[in-house]
């Protein structure tokens, strides 16, 4: 399939849509490269631990701050609801609450008996595969995450 004198190619070619191909790839393949294997082959042990530790610490720190804010909001909301109930501003229909709780329990029992969807299983298998191939990065991440939660 050589080019003729005007720059046109002889023969038929199939166009490859790279945008569609990259959409189907997991995020870690985009980060570490296509079928590059474990990141241990690309980076040194220290680099992997630093990458995992720093990202883990940042995630843990943000998780801690957001968690505190969420806990404060939920706790404050419950406190205000109890205060409003005690002072008579709102009246709770406990029979209706009990009926709804029983209905929710039944739905949970039904869902418990069903199998895990295949999409969830495949995602879990991808995560397990990533963790097995990148033990140092994952270990650094979890260590950093715990440090971030503590700071």
Curated annotation (Swiss-Prot):
> What is a biological process (GO) this protein takes part in?
intracellular triglyceride homeostasis
Q: Which residues lie on this side of the membrane: Mitochondrial intermembrane?
A: 64-69, 148-151
Record keywords: Membrane, Mitochondrion, Mitochondrion outer membrane, Nucleus, Phosphoprotein, Transcription, Transcription regulation, Transmembrane, Transmembrane helix
* Family affiliation: Belongs to the FUN14 family.
State the protein's name: FUN14 domain-containing protein 2
Q: Does the keyword Mitochondrion apply?
A: yes
Name the PANTHER family for this protein.
Answer: FUN14 DOMAIN CONTAINING, FUN14 DOMAIN-CONTAINING PROTEIN 2
As for membrane topology, the entry says: Multi-pass membrane protein
**Molecular function (Gene Ontology), one example:** phosphatidylinositol-3,4,5-trisphosphate binding
Q: Would the keyword Transcription be found if you checked this record's keyword annotation? A: yes
Q: Name one GO cellular component term.
A: nucleus
Q: What is the lineage of its organism?
A: Eukaryota, Metazoa, Chordata, Craniata, Vertebrata
């Amino acid at each position: 399939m050589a080019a003729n004198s005007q720059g046109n190619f002889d023969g038929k070619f199939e166009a490859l849509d790279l945008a569609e191909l990259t959409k189907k790839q997991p995020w870690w393949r985009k980060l570490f490269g296509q079928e590059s294997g474990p990141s241990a082959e690309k980076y040194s042990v220290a680099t992997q631990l630093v990458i995992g530790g720093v990202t883990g610490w940042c995630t843990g720190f943000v998780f801690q701050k957001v968690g505190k804010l969420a806990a404060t909001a939920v706790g404050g909301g419950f406190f205000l609801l109890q205060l409003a109930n005690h002072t008579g501003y709102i009246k709770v229909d406990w029979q209706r609450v009990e009926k709804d709780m029983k209905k929710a329990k039944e739905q949970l029992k039904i869902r418990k008996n069903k199998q895990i969807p295949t999409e969830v299983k495949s995602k879990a298998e991808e995560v397990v595969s990533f963790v097995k191939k990148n033990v140092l990065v994952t270990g650094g991440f979890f260590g950093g995450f715990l440090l971030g939660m503590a700071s």
